[in-house]
Swiss-Prot record:
GO terms for biological process: polysaccharide biosynthetic process. The cell wall polysaccharides of some oral streptococci act as receptors for the lectin-like surface adhesins on other members of the oral biofilm community, especially type 2 fimbriated strains of Actinomyces naeslundii, allowing colonization of the human tooth surface. Recognition of these receptor polysaccharides (RPS) depends on the presence of a host-like motif, either GalNAc beta 1-3Gal (Gn) or Gal beta 1-3GalNAc (G), within the oligosaccharide repeating units of different RPS structural types. Keywords: Exopolysaccharide synthesis, Transferase. InterPro entries: Stealth (IPR047141), Stealth_CR1 (IPR031358), Stealth_CR2 (IPR021520), Stealth_CR3 (IPR031357). Pfam families: Stealth_CR1 (PF17101), Stealth_CR2 (PF11380), Stealth_CR3 (PF17102). The keyword Transferase applies. This is Receptor polysaccharide phosphotransferase WefF. It comes from Streptococcus mitis.
Amino acid sequence: MVEKIDFVVAWVDGNDPVWRKKKAQYDGTINTSKEGMNSDKAYREWGTFKYWFRGVEKFAPWVNKVYLVTDNQKPSWLELNSDKLVLVDHTEIICNDYLPVFSANPIESNIHRIPGLSECFVFFNDDVYLTAPVEPTDFFSDDGLPKYVTALAPITTERYGTGHFQMNDMGIITTHFTREEILKNGKFFSIKQGVKGIAKSLLYRHSKFICGFWENHLTHPLLKSTMELVWEKEKDVLEKTSASRFRSPSDTNVWLFKYWQIASGQYAIGNPKLGGLFSLDNAGPDFWKLLNSRKYKVMCINDGFNVQNENQVMDDFIKAMNQLFPDKSSFEI
């Protein structure tokens, strides 16, 4: 049984005028349109972050510490005296020469530097919510290995998508692990991966090259020691990502460390039905019911690019979250 598991979440308030002024000093040549890799959409704050904390307290009361990583920001409702909360500034984990940064990639690549962080921790994006009770064994095996569900699957890239980062991640993985090692270590054909996962892997097992790993886009259980090892092996690449003020096609991202665990065989197979990825593009009455059904323990609820009647959808989202989490958490004033 793992003794301590911490949660780490990164957050930005894109509505903060001080932060916006700082960003404006650097983003003159950056494409911030809706279709761009550095779209302003990525920084929007709708007032839903408190529900992330309510989910943690309600459904994972066993968590050791919750580390909130920000750029000298904090939500107005945050209770700084909460016993489990630790506020972490970018200056504590990223070299000052690279700051400020307005991309998640350098932040996520340096979270292992958080002072006091436990060896076993779970990294969350702020749109990944706990929506039913979870146990430590949903994220780590009894002997401390992170749990993933994966499969062999090609990485698809779009001009402004994140597939570029995963391609770069896989380039590093295939430098350090042979095709044979990955197939041997990856556990892709275990029945625990689920029928769909095995079917994906069977399609690509005879490919000349390892084309990528399927990713469920939920939580990221990670080992601090693995991040340190990858940094030791690929310092120059990770320094380049750390210095990337805005998203760039040459970046790596946090999935690199998960990929390393898979390629080395240092992971345990998780529950294929743990959670799901959803977009507010398609939100409606059926989705709000699903959100409150507790069918999934973890839900990534993505603020989509093509949400119709955006303000109404966000109002409905907040109402649904209030039904699921009607009570304030100890993380709130």
